[in-house]
């Protein structure tokens, strides 16, 4: 009787341990799809451009409205970068400017690399 009880307890212990491990793997691999589906319903901006168009059309600006940041500036090359913490603004000299990723370079390194690329040296 004691050996049957011991075998039953050991079997139950092994079953619950295996079930816990499989639930872990299900969450890691199969459960991720359920998480993605449920997170798609909460507060995400729709993939169409209607929100941007409405905001752009509703903005009041007597000079130039920057398309990337919706900032109102005097001339197009004065538009700020959308992500100034990670982008560096570089004026091209022809009345236009670009924002390029800093990429962890030291200050001014992005501008130097852009100039080298414009000259065909990079």
From Swiss-Prot:
Residues 1-20 form the signal peptide. Keywords: Signal. Coiled coil: none annotated. GO terms for biological process: ERAD pathway. It comes from the Eukaryota. The keyword Flavoprotein does not apply. InterPro entries: LCL2. Probable component of the endoplasmic reticulum-associated degradation (ERAD) pathway. Belongs to the LCL2 family. This is Long chronological lifespan protein 2.
């Amino acid at each position: 009787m004691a050996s049957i009880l011991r075998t039953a307890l050991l079997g139950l212990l092994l079953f619950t341990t295996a079930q816990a491990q499989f639930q872990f793997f299900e969450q890691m691999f199969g459960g991720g799809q359920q998480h993605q589906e449920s997170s798609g319903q909460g507060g995400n901006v729709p993939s169409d451009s209607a929100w941007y168009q409405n905001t752009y059309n509703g903005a009041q600006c007597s000079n130039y409205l920057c398309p990337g940041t919706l900032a109102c500036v005097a001339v197009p090359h004065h538009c700020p970068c959308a992500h100034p913490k990670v982008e560096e603004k570089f004026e091209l000299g022809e009345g236009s400017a670009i924002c390029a990723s800093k990429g962890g370079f030291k200050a001014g390194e992005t501008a130097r690399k852009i100039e080298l690329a414009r000259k065909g040296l990079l």
